[in-house]
Structure formats: structure tokens, C-alpha cells
Amino acid sequence: MSYKGFPSHSKVSKEDQEFYDLKNKAAEYYRSNGVPQKIESVLNEMFWQKPDDIYGYLANYFSGLSYTPVISKITGKEVFDGRGLTAVQAEVHCIIRNEEKMVCGAVMDGSFDGLPDGVESGEMLSNGDLQHLSITMALKWIRENFSPVLRGFNPTDQTNVDKILSDFAMARYLEHKDSLIREKEEELRNEAMSEAPPQATPTSAPAKDKKGNDKGKKGNITENPLPPAEPPVPRLPGATAVGAVSLAVAKTAAELLGTPLYRHITAVRDPQAQKEMQLPVPIITIMSCGKNSAGKLNLLEEIILMPSSSLRVREVIGMGLDLQCEMRRILNGSTYKALPVGVSDEGALQVGFDRPEQALDLLAEACANLALPLGSDLHLAVNCAAHSLMDYSRGKYEVMSGCHKSPDELVDIYEGLINKYPAIRSLIDPFRKEDVGQWERLASVIGQSCCLLADAASNLCPRWREAKPLPPGATKAIIRHHSDMTISDLIQSIAEHKETILAAGSGDASMVDLAVGSGVSFLKLGGLRGAKRMDKYNRLMAIEEEQEGIAGAGEINQPVSFESESGWNSLTVSAK
């Protein structure tokens, strides 16, 4: 028996033939993939460069030739967020150089989806069934829907990943909305069936009813009824999976590309924007005198420092820290010594005052002692959080304990504060969103001296949910990265609203990267207490240093200045 490649007179065993065939296949396999040429090339290059770490050099060389990592699966876990509420963590696993690895994870605030508007954190905890349903549904979506569909996707393809997430959420939202409508219709039918038939009416009854109706009409002439609260927007249980997966994919892409997350988000938004990087101006919650404080005053939920865009991040933080120390020193004096002082949930100084003037006078005194430029490089915003102050039984706002004011009376209070303290340049949520007449009247009264911002009074939504216009007179909405919003939703919302404020929630420091990458103008991080908040401030400082002081540079697109007549007061937003 002879075999090609061997002498004709030789005899080759079956094992030798198989081994020879195997060697030929191996040689062909390596030749077809260019392995000999690449090995020869890297060995030649390495010889001339003579690196200290030979195998590290080889590893880097061949890593550059490996396939692009793709998503292999997405997993979900139930965790706790920064406020101790249950939340969903999404983790992205990729095939990297033939091995499956967990690359990055992301946790979204667990309190948003499936919960009614205006619910406080304590109420969320008591409503454990609804929260548990939302978390369970989110984990199911990740496991059964998102993971199979996104398998094989390049993590850098953020736009298409987000479209898949949004399309799925939209379909589920429409189903959920139809289900709620059917439940309401069924409830109304059951109520109608359970009602007893009307009793016979005496002949004299119409005259009495007419008289009674006349009295009612007379009373209505003098009444100014409070507009009822709008029904809460239907939340979609499980939608937190959308935001968690979208953010986890973005963080995974940045990790695999070896680039900071903010640069990757910038590239997703607009590759050309890398040349015009802009840092947001940090605004700091310096004091809280809201409902949770020990004093009678409820109205000033947050007093916020609004610095000029010319100040660097480190300068702004330094001013805020100095100001807090000085206010504490003053509070320890004889004038204020009896006032209860603590730290709010937002990480700010929490003081129990009885009147708004006391808080603003304290702040003005501290700024004067430190020679801080209050009214020039530093201005104030006041978050009134009026939606939380409404006493519906009285139809008035409880601005102080036992002191109730009508919406019209509240307009006069705000006008007086702005006239007395001209450093106040913004009021956040001065009324409920339903009090449209007072929004409009206050905007007319204060004119260009102050602008009105909507936070809780706004309804910015992901693309798959209906948005509503801002209250009349409000010049801007404060945007939040809600748990049911994708990265693309956030970028789109910011692009549609110029000179935007982004409020970071209880998430990690990646919110700062999202703010920088999405091109937001102002970043609301809360107070200067708490490790997680200071991590965010430190992250913003690190990005500023990396950008070599790009914030406030003349050739860069600067955020709007509060002193400019073409600034906030000239901006209008028709829809969120």
C-alpha cells in the first residue's frame, strides 16, 4: 500500500496516514487564517522593539486581531439602591476572546416604575406588594425577553439596542393601558348594576330641588374651586429593566472600548461633539427647610446655589463647603442656638425655621462673612415642592405648620421674597401643575427677574409614553433619568430642551458621565454630604481635570449665564 507524499515502496500504517492528514489540515487551517504571516510579523517587530514584557507584547498584538466582543447574555439581580429600596441590577455578559465574561452592570433607582406619582419613600416601603411585582416583572423581562433578543449584539450599537428595548416597552405599555381601561369599565358596570332603582318622587319635590339648586348656584358664584389633581400617569411594572439594561450596555461598551463613559455617550449622541465637549455647571443644594425639617416652615424644600459658568467645579464645591461651615458656625451662636439642625436626605444642611426670611437671611449673612459674590457669580434657586404642601381638605397650601395659603396668596408670597432677595433667580415647582392660572400670573408678576422651573410639575417621559406640556410660565423642566428611560431617550430629551438641568438620583457616579456626554448644561447633584454624592462631585472634578479646565473656556459652548437677558427667561418649551 502506498500513500501520496511517501516513497512508493514504503508502506504506511493507518495511524501514520491519519496523522499526516491531520498535519495537512492544520497547516491549511493556519495558512487560510494567515497565522504564519502574522506570527512572523509580530516576532520581527518584537525583536526590534525588545519589550520588557514579551508575552504581554504578544497578548496585546493578538488581542487587536481578535473578534469584536458580542453580548452572550444579560442577567438580572434584585439588589438595594442608595435609599435602601429594592431595585434591579442588569449585568451584561460578553464573549471575549472565546470566553464568556461579565463585563459591566447597572442599577437603576427602584422607586419609579409601577408606583404612583408623589409617593414618598416610606410609603413605597409600605407598598411592598406593588414594588415586589415590579421587580419580579423586570427580572422576567431581562431573563426571558431582553437576553435572548440581544444575544449576538455588539454592545457599542447603543441606538439599535435602545430601539429594541423601547419597542418592547411600548408594546407592554399599550397592553397595560388597555388592561387598566377594561378594569375601569368593568368596575363602572358593576357599580351601575349594584345601584338600587330610584324611588318615586313626590309632586312637590321639583320645587324644593329647584330652590336647592338655586342656592347651590349662588354659592358657586363666590367660590373659586381648586382644580382637582390630575390622575397619575399609568406606570408600567417592570419598566425599570429598560433603563437598567440600556445603562449596563452603555457601560459595557465604554469598558470594552477602553474609553470613559462620558466620551462614549458623546459619540452616541454626536461623533462630532467630541470636539466641543462641555462640562455642566454643578448646582448645589445648600440648605433644606421643607416638610421634613423640625421647624414650622414647609415652603423651602431646597435652597440651591446656582454658580456662574465661569467658575471651575473645584471652586464651586469649595464655596459650598465653606458656606456650610459658616452657616453651622452662625447657627451655633446665641441667635440661632435653639434651632434644630441636621442633614437632609439630599445631603444638605437641614434647619428648622419658622419663616422663609430666617433661612434666606442666614444664607445672606454667611455669604457676606465669607465675601462670596451672592447676586453676581452666585445666585439662588428655591425648590418649593408645592405639590407636597397641598391640603386638599382646605384647598390651600400649608406653607407653614397651621398656616394655609390659597394659590393666589402664594403668588404674593413669592413676589415678596423675590423683591426682598434679588439673588433668587429661579423657583422650582412653586405650584402644583394643575394651578395653571397661578403659574401664568406669577410669571407675569416676576417678569425677567426670576424664572420658573418644573420638576414634579413636568412630565418628561420615554418615547413610548405620552408627554404633556409644561405649565404656562414655566421656562424649563428639570430632567431626570427615570428607570424606564433608555440612554437614547435621555439624549433625545436633553436635545429637545436647550440649556437643561439634569437631576441625578440615588444612582452611582455614572450619572455624571451621562450628564457630560449628553450635553446637559446644569447638573443637580444634591448637597455636599454623603459618600455617594461626593463620589459624583469628585467624578465631575476628575472629568474637568481630564478636559484641562474646559468648563468656562471661551471657545467652548458655555452654559447659559443667569445674568444674560438671552438666557433662561427667553427660553420656551412647548412639550416635554
Swiss-Prot record:
**Which InterPro entries does its entry note?**
DD_ENO4, Enolase, Enolase-like_C_sf, Enolase-like_N, Enolase_C, Enolase_N
Instruction: Tell me which UniProt keywords the record has, alphabetically.
Output: Glycolysis, Lyase
Where in the sequence does UniProt note compositional bias of the Low complexity kind?
Answer: 196-206
Any one of the GO CC terms: phosphopyruvate hydratase complex
Looking up Pfam families in the UniProt record yields: Enolase_C (PF00113)
What is any one GO biological process for this UniProt entry? glycolytic process
Q: Which reaction is the catalytic activity of this chain?
A: (2R)-2-phosphoglycerate = phosphoenolpyruvate + H2O
Q: Where is the composition biased (Basic and acidic residues)?
A: 207-217
Q: Which biological pathway?
A: Carbohydrate degradation; glycolysis; pyruvate from D-glyceraldehyde 3-phosphate: step 4/5
**Enzyme Commission (EC) number:** 4.2.1.11
Q: What class of enzyme is it?
A: lyase
The organism's place on the tree of life at top rank: Eukaryota
For the region Disordered, what residue ranges are annotated? 187-232
Q: Where is substrate annotated to bind?
A: E302, K524
Q: Which GO terms describe its molecular function?
A: magnesium ion binding; phosphopyruvate hydratase activity
Which family is this sequence assigned to? Answer: Belongs to the enolase family.
- Record protein name field: Enolase 4
Q: Which organism is it from?
A: Danio rerio (Zebrafish)
Gene name per UniProt: eno4
